[in-house]
């Protein structure tokens, strides 16, 4: 492995489509994985080891548009305890549906668009979301997702816009229908389109504190 390699990005690069596999992560002390495999539409990961993310704060858009990605590459064992940004990490990963329940998300502040238009439907109800401020578009058009996330700590979230929404009435409807009535929404300012086209959602959210909401 190159001795000075600390960061990798494929965004808008010529070889993105031709990158088809990561077979080993090695001992590289990464400083960022932001945009690392973005638009690598043929990518799978066969590596059995895990990357060294001890110095990484952003995984934003790491696998965005990796439309075939769904190989079981020990993702659940990744140490993301230093990560603050997960925005768009699996956006447009239509095939992706791997376990992430063991992730330490205690320091994450941004989960916007994380699973947007992905095939994800795994248990993440135990995630620590106490520091998250942005959940906008987190599950937008993630039409398979229907898991219990009712115990999430949303006290610091300010943006939930389009969180469970779809773009238009012609899209496949969201099937999400879980009890999130106990969420603390006292900090939320933006809820615009939060349940747009969520035709199956039928839960009581009447006790939500919407005192600070300016956009519904």
Name what the model sees in each region:
Residues 1-215:
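Negatively charged
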